[in-house]
Amino acid sequence: MAEPLLQLTRVTRRFPAGDKDVVVLDDVSLSIDAGEIVAIVGASGSGKSTLMNILGCLDHPSSGSYRVGARETSELESDELARLRREHFGFIFQRYHLLPHLSAAENVEMPAVYAGSAQAQRRERALMLLARLGLSDRAGHRPSQLSGGQQQRVSIARALMNGGEVILADEPTGALDSKSGHDVIRVLRELNALGHTVIIVTHDENVAAHARRIIEISDGRIVGDRLNPHADGADAASGASGDAGPQRARRLSAGVGRFAEAFRMAWIALVSHRLRTLLTMLGIIIGITSVVSIVAIGEGAKRYMLDEIGSIGTNTINVYPGADWGDSRADAIQTLVPADAAALADQIYVDSATPETSRSLLLRYRNIDVNALVSGVGERFFQVRGMKMAQGIAFGPDEVRRQAQVAVIDENTRRKLFGANPNPLGEVILIDNLPCIVIGVTAAKKSAFGDTKNLNVWVPYTTASGRLFGQRHLDSITVRVRDGQPSAAAEQSLTKLMLQRHGRKDFFTYNMDSVVKTVEKTGQSLTLLLSLIAVISLVVGGIGVMNIMLVSVTERTREIGIRMAVGARQADIMQQFLVEAVTVCLMGGAIGIVLSLGMSFVFSLFVDQWKMVFSAGSIVSAFLCSTLIGVVFGFMPARNASRLDPIDALARD
């Protein structure tokens, strides 16, 4: 004798009610063979719906055994039970339980999505089933556009999507008029004739009369189990349905299909509540805009400061006489000489070196007298300091060798001495009674350190030493380190060379790289501090996302129950709500980045000294941050959704 398809042995189901348990099913034993059409009849509260839920693996016995084929359901995990519902059972509910935002075809396709069927195959089968049930012209209609009988036929098509070896119909005609109810019963009998096992739960004796076997239940006990000799036809000869579901796609394709469905459902849910979605995203938008903008402003400010430092000579090392800044004996030390600069310039780590000596002297041009800082420098001075010429040229090695009486002046000196004359080249000025020809004017530069009003004049250091200052020693030497050479190592080598030349430590160095590092470190610290403040708004936005997702789970509890009934696993439900949370956050992140880019334009209208500098890294980080917020703050609502009991979820309005 063949093993029963469904077999319950001494099944009891209790539900807690305060301090006591209410027994809904009491010691029920029942077997149903493949291919039968069975009616379970009883009054309201008799336990017939609970029995159907246990038969469909939506609920579980408190005690006793329930076997589907050779499988004991009490030994199965939740995902294995979902697979049983997905591959063996098809549910037809009294209230249809169609998702209102999906079309008829999309509702029918749902079980195949969770079964991993390819999109084209499941759409083809859904249309075939709807056509078979006389709904080919209603495939694109939503449930609200269908009559009750049409909605129930869509529900039947959904039950058949994956094959529907066992059809469980809970009061299938309860909400229909007599004609529609008769049509539904006719369809169920036809399905039984095709090999489907059909179980009808009803309180209507007229509906039960169409079944070959009638099981009566009262107060949780089976009080009758009889064959119905008045039913037309006979049960199907074979329990195997000739209507197999669509072929499964490969695992990767199935996963992609489920993810695409989750994303589509997330999009539908977000669009259907536009204002709520916008308000939910607002915290994320503000947070991402703040973080990206602050990082861009900080990067722009840092680059601007580094450029300004570059204007006074980056990658340079200055050598001064004395032990350190403020050394009282520094003026008496006269060992720093031009030969030291020449020796340093020959080192492989040095790009160029220039001696420097300076005094404040009187300048005269015609009847105009002014005080200016006169500096004697080498021919590489302007290269070392990164200074450009607005007019004329700088002096070269020949002028240095000849102690030439030539001078380069800055823009401030040009304005003071020459006023409206835009071209002072070739004019002769007196520097402390030494006539010098102006051969160049340096370009004016705006500085973050303020626009200096000092007057500066540069002459060859040989001219300054021999003709102006009357001294052979230098005030300082500026060394420009070759590109690619580590500044710290160059400073160590420079110090070693100077010690060898002087025989003692009568000098000290000042590395501009330390200024650069200080600026970079300060900029990074400020950016980090401001970013942490901005991140607070991201956290607040994330909490907002979590709150709204919890509300969404509550609102869509019945939808979750429907999806579980048609075979969705806990992971599928969790994925759907996680995708929704991540989608909200990614949309907020994208809008935040766009707003930040727009802010850079507005920023440039009010601040002309530097610009906001965006990097691909900061934008990618913003998207990753949005995704992380969606996952972290969407996890709890998604987990709550996945842990809902299918029966409780279906009972929610």
From Swiss-Prot:
Domain ABC transporter: 6-244
Binding-site residues, ATP: 42-49
PROSITE patterns the UniProt entry points to: ABC_TRANSPORTER_1, ABC_TRANSPORTER_2, MACB
Transmembrane segments: 278-298, 526-546, 587-607, 616-636
InterPro entries (UniProt xref): AAA+_ATPase, ABC3_permease_C, ABC_transporter-like_ATP-bd, ABC_transporter-like_CS, MacB-like_ATP-bd, MacB_PCD, Macrolide_Exporter_MacB, P-loop_NTPase
Recorded GO CC terms: plasma membrane
GO MF terms held by the record: ATP binding; ATP hydrolysis activity; transmembrane transporter activity
Keyword Cell membrane carried by entry: yes
Pfam families per record: ABC_tran, FtsX, MacB_PCD
Membrane topology: Multi-pass membrane protein
EC number(s) per entry: 7.6.2.-
Subunit field text: Homodimer.
Cross-referenced PANTHER family: MACROLIDE EXPORT ATP-BINDING_PERMEASE PROTEIN MACB (PTHR30572:SF7), MEMBRANE COMPONENT OF TRANSPORTER-RELATED (PTHR30572)
Protein name: Macrolide export ATP-binding/permease protein MacB
Organism: Burkholderia thailandensis (strain ATCC 700388 / DSM 13276 / CCUG 48851 / CIP 106301 / E264)
Source lineage: Bacteria, Pseudomonadati, Pseudomonadota, Betaproteobacteria, Burkholderiales
